[in-house]
């Protein structure tokens, strides 16, 4: 049914479409309306020169120059994309490193790669306005610095699509950020109403949304499998598709230090693996984090070729509570980039 839905109550929705209004009743509902780019008060995207991330899929034109505002995951991926197209790119970084919250060494590796491609990094600059200026735009920052370019793209986060759903009629509660509150079954405070994906306020990853859908189906069908596990968002693997690729999972080194937790950190460069030399791409590294007392694998970060693929090995180890000894006892393919994981475990 193509239309706009809104709740009439906890067991009924109204759907307005070109064919008129329909009412649907049910024992269970899944809200998966996603999110949209966050637009601050100081900016008015026009879809031509001042863009949101949605306006860039695909870009209507290949800009000569572009200012990217926002240095999180989405922002750096657009920096990679537009610089690959040959655009002059300036990244406005509100802090002193890109990818705040990520491994500082991984962020530094990406910054070096960006600088090598001619990307300009404007650090410690918080954008306060993006304005049209002739045939281009100007990004104004709180410290007086300005960036002029033919285009600008906002990449400063997202907000949930909950407007128009009439959630109050169903009694569904939101959190302080406006996302739908869910429990470990992805169920809201109203029995039979579930939420998944970006609108749930958890990790905004397709893999997480798909797994949430699976867990919801299991809960609805009364799955009582002995191996059933609730979602642990702290153990979700994620990847950043730049060059180099960056991927991580589990406990971060900085997070452990901030909490005073003792960890063992082992870092191995890809240059130590024959496969990296065969590829003539020795850049990047594998970082493995484990418990020094038990040897349990707690997390890891990978920077380099196929990082998004290789992180799955560490993700499995983290989820299954494996130890570094388990990795050492595994017969990996040779030559393979994954051998760096063995070296890190050793």
Question: Which residues are covered by each model-predicted region?
Answer:
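Rossmann-like dinucleotide-binding cores of NAD(P)H-dependent redox enzymes
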Residues: 57-58, 63-67, 73-138, 142-143, ...
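Short loop/edge segments at beta-strand edges and connector loops
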Residues: 1-4, 9, 33, 52-54, ...
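Glycine-rich dinucleotide-binding loop and its adjacent helix/turn
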Residues: 31-91, 120-121, 168-185, 189
């Amino acid at each position: 049914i193509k239309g706009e839905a809104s709740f009439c109550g906890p067991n009924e929705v109204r759907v307005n479409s070109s064919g008129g209004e329909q009412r649907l009743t049910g024992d269970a509902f899944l809200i998966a309306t996603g999110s949209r780019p966050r637009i601050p008060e100081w900016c008015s995207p026009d879809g031509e020169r001042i863009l949101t991330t949605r306006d860039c899929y695909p870009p209507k034109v290949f800009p000569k120059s572009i200012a990217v505002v926002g240095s999180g995951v989405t922002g750096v991926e657009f920096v990679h994309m537009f610089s690959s197209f040959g655009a002059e790119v300036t990244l406005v970084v509100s802090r002193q490193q890109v990818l705040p919250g990520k491994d500082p060494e991984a962020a530094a590796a990406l910054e070096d790669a960006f600088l090598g491609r001619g990307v300009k990094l404007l650090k410690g600059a918080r954008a306060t306005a993006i304005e049209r200026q002739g045939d281009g735009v100007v990004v104004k920052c709180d410290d007086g610095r300005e960036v002029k370019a033919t285009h600008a793209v906002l990449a400063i986060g997202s907000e949930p699509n909950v407007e128009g759903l009439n959630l109050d009629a169903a009694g569904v509660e939101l959190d302080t950020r406006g996302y739908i509150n869910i429990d470990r079954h992805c169920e809201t405070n109203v029995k039979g109403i579930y939420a998944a994906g970006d609108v749930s306020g958890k990790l905004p990853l397709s893999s997480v949304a798909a797994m949430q859908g699976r867990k919801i189906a299991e809960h609805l069908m009364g799955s009582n499998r002995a191996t059933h596990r609730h979602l642990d968002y702290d153990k979700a693997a994620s990847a950043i598709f730049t060059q180099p690729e960056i991927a991580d999972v589990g406990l971060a080194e900085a997070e452990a230090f901030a909490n005073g937790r003792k960890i063992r950190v082992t870092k191995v460069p890809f240059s130590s693996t024959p496969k990296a030399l065969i590829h003539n791409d020795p850049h990047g590294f594998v970082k493995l984090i484990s418990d020094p007392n038990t040897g349990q694998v707690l997390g890891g970060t990978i920077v380099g070729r196929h990082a998004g693929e290789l992180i799955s090995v560490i993700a499995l180890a983290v989820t299954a509570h494996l130890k570094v000894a388990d990795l050492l006892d595994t017969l990996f393919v040779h030559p393979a980039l994954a051998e760096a994981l063995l070296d890190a475990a050793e």
